Amino acid sequence: MALVRGFMAAKKILGGSVAGTRKETSAPKGFLAVYVGESQRKKQRHLVPVSYLNQPLFQALLIKAEEEFGFNHPMGGLTIPCPEDTFLTVTSQIQG
């Protein structure tokens, strides 16, 4: 039992989720949270390095988001309206 308490305390100190209780509201330093998907209900949250903002492939996704949503994103964060597999392909190409 002490081992479990120690594990939970360590997770809390490190900022990890204990049984999924942590809210997904912030991104680590140097990263940007984006919501990806075409359906309003099936959006997935992804963390991308802020350096991607300078990449032409990622900028094309941002332009698509601007055309569809302007600056009013329904998820409260940056929403990219494309299939998740397309997003993953783009980000893997940027990674090299």
Swiss-Prot record:
Induction comment from the UniProt entry of this chain: PIF4-dependent regulation by temperature. In low thermo-responsive cultivars (e.g. Col-0), higher expression at 28 degrees Celsius than at 22 degrees Celsius in petioles but not in leaf blades. In high thermo-responsive cultivars (e.g. cv. Alst-1 and cv. Ang-0) higher expression at 28 degrees Celsius than at 22 degrees Celsius in both petioles and leaf blades.
Chief location: membrane
UniProt keyword annotation of Cell membrane present: yes
This protein's record includes keyword Nucleus: no
Effect of loss of the gene: Reduced rosette weight and area at 22 degrees Celsius but not at 28 degrees Celsius.
UniProt entry keywords in alphabetical sequence: Auxin signaling pathway, Cell membrane, Developmental protein, Growth regulation, Membrane
Pfam families the record matches: Auxin_inducible
One of the GO biological process terms: response to temperature stimulus
Topological category with respect to the lipid bilayer: Peripheral membrane protein
Segment forming the signal sequence: none
Assigned GO CC terms: plasma membrane
Intracellular or extracellular location(s): Cell membrane
Assigned protein family: Belongs to the ARG7 family.
Function: Functions as a positive effector of cell expansion through modulation of auxin transport. Involved in thermo-responsiveness of plant architecture. Enhances plasma membrane H(+)-ATPase.
PANTHER family named among the record's database cross-references: SAUR-LIKE AUXIN-RESPONSIVE PROTEIN FAMILY-RELATED
Protein's UniProt name: Auxin-responsive protein SAUR29
